[in-house]
Amino acid sequence: MTRVAVVAGGGEHTGPAVALRLAAGGFDVALLGSEFTSADKTVRRVEEYGRQCVTVRAELSDARSVAVAFGRVRTALSGPAVLVTCVGPQPLPDGLPEDESADEQRYTAVRRALRPVFVCCQAGAGQLLRHRWGRIIIVTEPADADGNTWRTSRPVLDGLIGFTRSAALELARSGTTVNLVAPADRAADSRAPAHRAAGDDSAGSYADGVAHVTEFLVDERAVGITGQAIRVAARADVPLLRER
């Protein structure tokens, strides 16, 4: 297999944390996304591990844009063996009424959250099939405590669980595993932010937990783990891993 990993999305916390952990494990890394607010720092730190790191702009919900991005990754590094795609629940307009129009907006928000996973996995699977070995890891971010993304977090998570299981079955014969990493805290249980602890700043700790799990899933020891939803704590008062 090649030692190249693609990390799509992930913002300022999860994506960089995963990229650095993969680099420490001997992977060259390509960062895919539409914005790179902290990319320079991530690139420098990856290079400190003696690995290469490139940033490739792509609209992750657009199949053509992602296909072009993967082509650039192949040119700059090589065909990837690992794909990590990070997504999060989408916000809804404040004061949304309970009617058919509101339902359609909720469906749209859920589709908007799920679309990048489908697009990136479709593009990445084609690359992994060539190697007859691969790891696909889908990461969903915790709901924002200051917004209303908790309202879409449960349907997004349910959709990702179903997709993960289906993709794992489809790709099993090719030596590719597919797993989901999701928050273990109450943000994933479709509860309002009022139920969460005050002053909760969990982005960094969750990112570290995701990076830790990713490191294990890309290892040969995890060859038999596929189609699973692994829950990671997003707060210090929740155990790091919780069995689903």
From Swiss-Prot:
It holds the Pfam family adh_short. The keyword Mitochondrion does not apply. Transmembrane segments: none annotated. Non-catalytic subunit of the NovJ(2)K(2) heterotetramer that catalyzes the NADPH-dependent reduction of the tyrosyl moiety of L-beta-OH-Tyr-S-NovH intermediate to yield the tethered beta-ketotyrosyl-S-NovH in the novobiocin biosynthesis pathway. Novobiocin is an aminocoumarin family antibiotic that targets bacterial DNA gyrases. Belongs to the short-chain dehydrogenases/reductases (SDR) family. Heterotetramer; the NovJ(2)K(2) heterotetramer is composed of subunits of 2 NovJ and 2 subunits of NovK. This is Short-chain dehydrogenase/reductase family member NovK. It comes from Streptomyces niveus (Streptomyces spheroides).
